[in-house]
């Protein structure tokens, strides 16, 4: 849950969250910004929230930009990227394909529109990693929930500044995600580390 700050925040930062549809992005934002877990899944088109966060003695007004992960919105989603200070790339721990798409789709899109902007990889739905039903359903497909080691390897490959797991349903790790994101947004753009991907061509934040 976001930490309320009495005075008006003197620092403003923009956070954009991306990832496959239904991977848990919107629930994560709602739990942090509003303190409640939505019981009904409604696919996001675009939505914005604002949360006041205090980290390391600094007050920050964090604008939270939610996006749609469905392919239908691939041409519209880039409108959210300009002026971003930090990007959360999310995947769902119970959906191995969603982690594969971090490498296959999301990192190249983020690098294309937001060169140098700090990236945090977020593993959503951590409560499902050991859920018996989820484990059994994945086993029937020859799969298993994503392990921390697998996700950390992807985080390293894409040049993420951090990897954090969370569960919007239980509240586990939610505050840590946004505190880490706020700190990363205050550091500013990076120019030293390059993600180990085929997409080496990057552009500044632009709008299609």
Swiss-Prot record:
Keywords: Cell membrane, GTP-binding, Lipoprotein, Membrane, Methylation, Nucleotide-binding, Prenylation. The modification Cysteine methyl ester is found at residue 205. Residues 191-208 have a biased composition (Basic residues). SMART domains: RAB, RAS, RHO. Residues 188-208 are annotated as: Disordered. CDD domains: RhoA_like. Residues 206-208 form a propeptide. The keyword Transmembrane does not apply. The keyword Transit peptide does not apply. Its main location: membrane. GO terms for biological process: small GTPase-mediated signal transduction. A motif (Effector region) lies at residues 41-49. GO terms for molecular function: GTP binding; GTPase activity. This is GTP-binding protein Rho1. It comes from Kluyveromyces lactis (strain ATCC 8585 / CBS 2359 / DSM 70799 / NBRC 1267 / NRRL Y-1140 / WM37) (Yeast). The lineage of its organism: Eukaryota, Fungi, Dikarya, Ascomycota, Saccharomycotina.
